[in-house]
Amino acid sequence: MPGTRGPRVAMLSVHTSPLDQPGTGDAGGMNVYVLELSRALARRGAEVEIFTRATSSAQPPVVDVQPGIRVLHVPAGPFEGLDKNDLPGQLCAFTAGVLRAEAHRSEGWYDVVHTHYWLSGQAGWLAAERWDVPLVHTMHTMARVKNAALAPGDVPEPQGRVIGEEQVVAASDALVASTREEAEDLVRLYGADLDRIHVVPPGVDLDTFTPPVPSDATARTALRERLGLPVDSPLILFAGRVQLLKGPDVLVQALEHLPEEVRLVVLGGASGRPTAVRELEALAHQCGVRDRVLVHPPVERRRLADWYRAADVVAVPSHNESFGLVAAEAQACGTPVVAAAVGGLRTVVLDDVNGVLVDGHDPLAWADVLGALLADDGRRARLAAGARAASRRFGWDEAAAAMLDVYAQATKRRPAR
């Protein structure tokens, strides 16, 4: 990598654009990760071009996000109507689009290919070989991990994805894991070379996700009024895609066993199944709590911080999370988190320090934990203070510095492969 300038990074995110609204469709923490990491890399002098599949004829071919960051919409298959599981059939077209973009550059333009999720890894593998640059890959989720922790009624990941992930793991010059547990899964489940794995925790935008100022009850009341939320009710917030993997149904069923005044706010849209929100509302009706569940579409990130601040507790009942960005963001806003003791959530949430971990997904167990915390103002205040302190562990500038080191190490080791 040249020493006179920052690296030129081809960032691939096939199935979801960093410009999409998180909380709907396939847009979630990975979108935030790709965009915020790119911004932090650009602040350190890198030039980042993000390749993503075009999903609308109205999308411009290129979007200049800010100096040093461009998003390129690559036509690959129909704009609409493709499920994520249909995308392997469009990878040849996507890869060709990525290679065409480089063809308009001077030879050797890109210094590194950084891919996100296995679909991108497949395309990036070919691009990196063609350009003779290192391939750095971040899994974000793994089929074997997801299939071992399926929610009741959820559909397992196909074997084709497992094979694709094995290929990408073997081809990568460097693998980036968000936590040590994820690194161990890469070795245990995919036979990854430990020497090629780098643990780089994602960051949180600590300028956006901040504690409320002022933090008194009057300010909380005004905030809830502005958001259209009940002023006097204890509020549990679920923020994320409405899908079985994320476990919002656990909270709806738990609500049946909580005091009448408690409200659950579901901030997110359907993912995978277009009827997911309606099905969750039907479950709430079946449990007799429909009037206590408030469903709101996802909001842009600066507004999201206010929703975290307005809640008494943020609940993350996911069946699996490689990291748990919602938990980290909520903590940065000074809101205690109740989370499932799975995956990366065990790294983000330190039990009884900045939140509470719950074993399993039994609604009664969740009701017990949530009810006890909502009834204990002193404990919530202590956990809120711990949450604010713990959030300082995660910053995007630190993540970018570590990632630049990963790129440099991958470049050094590539000739030996």
Swiss-Prot record:
Where do the annotations place UDP-N-acetyl-alpha-D-glucosamine binding? Q21, P22, G29, R241, K246, V299, E321, E329
This protein's record includes keyword Transferase: yes
| UniProt GO MF annotations | acetylglucosaminyltransferase activity; D-inositol-3-phosphate glycosyltransferase activity; magnesium ion binding
Q: Provide the E.C. number(s) assigned to this enzyme.
A: 2.4.1.250
Q: Which reaction does it catalyse?
A: 1D-myo-inositol 3-phosphate + UDP-N-acetyl-alpha-D-glucosamine = 1D-myo-inositol 2-acetamido-2-deoxy-alpha-D-glucopyranoside 3-phosphate + UDP + H(+)
Signal peptide (residue range): none
List positions binding 1D-myo-inositol 3-phosphate: H15, D26, A27, G28, G29, M30, N31, K84, Y117, T141, R161
One GO biological-process annotation of the entry reads: mycothiol biosynthetic process
Q: Where, by residue number, does Mg(2+) bind?
A: Y308, R309, A311, T335
Q: Oligomeric state and partners?
A: Homodimer.
Instruction: Identify its protein family.
Output: Belongs to the glycosyltransferase group 1 family. MshA subfamily.
The protein's matches in NCBIfam families, at most eight in alphabetical order, are given as: mycothiol_MshA
User: Its function?
Assistant: Catalyzes the transfer of a N-acetyl-glucosamine moiety to 1D-myo-inositol 3-phosphate to produce 1D-myo-inositol 2-acetamido-2-deoxy-glucopyranoside 3-phosphate in the mycothiol biosynthesis pathway.
Q: What is this protein called?
A: D-inositol 3-phosphate glycosyltransferase
